[in-house]
Amino acid sequence: MPSEKTVYLPDKNVAKNAHISSFAQYKEMYQQSIDNPEEFWGEIAKQFHWENPINYDKFFTFNFDVCKGPIYTKWLDGATTNISYNLLDRNIRNGHGDKIAFYWEGNHPDDYSRLTYKKLLEEVCRFANVLKSKGIKRGDRVAIYMPMILESVIAILACTRIGAVHSLVFAGFSADSFSERIIDCQARALITADGVWRGEKYLALKSICDQAMDKCAKNGHNVEVCFVVSHLERVTAPSGVQSNQSNKTPMQDGRDIWWHDVVPQASTSCYPEWMQSEDPLFMLYTSGSTGKPKGVLHTTGGYLLYAATTFKYVFDYKPNDVYWCTADIGWITGHTYVVYGPLANAATSVLYEGTPFYPQNDRFWGVVEKYKVNQFYTAPTAIRALMKFEDSLVTRHDLSSLRVLGSVGEPINPEAWMWYYKLVGGEKCSIVDTFWQTETGGHVLTPLPGATPMKPGAASFPFFGVQPVLLDESGKEIQGEGEGYLVFSRPWPGMMRSLYNNHDRYETTYFSKFPGYYCTGDGARRDADGYLWVTGRVDDMLNVSGHLMSTAEVESVLTEHRGVSEAAVVAKPHPVKGE
């Protein structure tokens, strides 16, 4: 295995054509982003549409010190825009209307479709008009519990079109967890599908939503309208399974509406709601160490800049590339790097519904070959699971289109890194091992494909505008080599602004331990070459397959059993799922 000193240089062909083609160029741009953030991000902001111009005197203000007053971050304050306009109308005006926005690849290889930017805009406007017809307006919260289908992207962007705040919940969460999140954000509308196949497993999404809405009603909150996509009848069921599930979808009169009954006849024109840069865009729940989920709140202008810029540089995206992120849209990776970041760059992406193992264990590599994918972004858990199979499952496919391989969710172990680099990338691809969180909105520590010499397992260096610091237990900064708490001393545009309806908890969780710093809850160490290595959580959180769960959350479930009076949960390493 490589030692900590082992360095892999970017392939000459990757570096030669990269947006950032040397480490010296990275360092120069990074320094500019720290010394002159207004100038650095202001130049990037010019690529986007602002209905109200940007006031450069109020471009960027913040306070990270609880001793000096309330914690806040503001970027481009006073400027107005609409993200769906920037992702769709702007790209169409720039000549990309007929470009493929998404290749949709279903759970079964016989199911696939595609959607252009022009068609995506039409469908977004249709559904936005339907939402408006049901009284959904600017600032209202909309809960989304959807599989990886095109309507999920349409629903997200329809919310942003009219200024509604979307709250996605991964369609694997229980009705209990979902209802807790619906009640917390007081969602007026819910969007789901009748059901979905994941591999050979059937998930009755609408039934789970019904249970969740019942629980909400018992707790005094009624969801006013539930839109249901009829998905099952248009897809191929796993062989040997009869797909008559759609007949069983229960619909409640006056509340539940089939998508196909209202969307096709709606108008394809919907004027965008111009939002303040600091208006809420979406909220996404993440586990809290006390057990109650935290509604992480992201806002409009800064998030747009950061999603767009990290996507462009970290994946070195070029106009004719095909990009594929395997993450579910229910997680932050799906928000930033399946929906917002790619579309902000007029990218063509693959949207994949299934698992890595269906119908065979080489499905990922078959999809890469089918669409000639250039950038592939997945989790170490998936890589470790796929490593267990024979190499021929990878080598039988033509993966020569690949240029950048990404990793997300947890630090990648060196064994998995080497397998990914050698077997999947043929020692020609750059690996970007990205560290970030739901709270950060986008990558904060990452190599850049053409610029950063790679160390297997290292998160490497900060992205533009990000200033990492290592602190010891007493809050003293660790210079040079050393290990400590990973904190950040200033905000970047894509950072969370608050926890929904709970700013006190926001300040306590992230800013009280070390006044003046955003505390990630992770530890890290800096090696002799200045590379940062994330060492894992330093709070009461478990990292399971790249997803955070609190020990308190698991303990509370265990103690619900009448045979359990006390429960304590500790992490245990797992060869595939991590620790």
Kindly label every feature range from the protein language model.
Residues 98-100, 224-231, 242-243, 250-285, ...:
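Conserved pre-ATP/AMP-binding loop-to-beta segment of ANL
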Residues 260, 347, 374-378, 387-454, ...:
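Gly/Ser/Thr-rich phosphate-binding loop
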Residues 461-465, 476-510, 547-549:
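Conserved ATP/PPi-binding loop(s) of AMP-dependent carboxylate-activating enzymes
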Residues 302-322, 332-375, 388-392:
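Conserved AMP-binding/adenylation subdomain of ANL enzymes
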Residues 113-118, 273-274, 281-305:
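Conserved AMP-binding A3 loop
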Residues 84-85, 98, 102-157, 174-179, ...:
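Conserved AMP-binding/adenylate-forming core of the ANL superfamily
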Residues 157, 161-261, 379-380:
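Structural core segment of the AMP-binding/adenylate-forming
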Residues 169-195, 209, 369, 376, ...:
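AMP-binding/adenylate-forming catalytic core of the ANL superfamily
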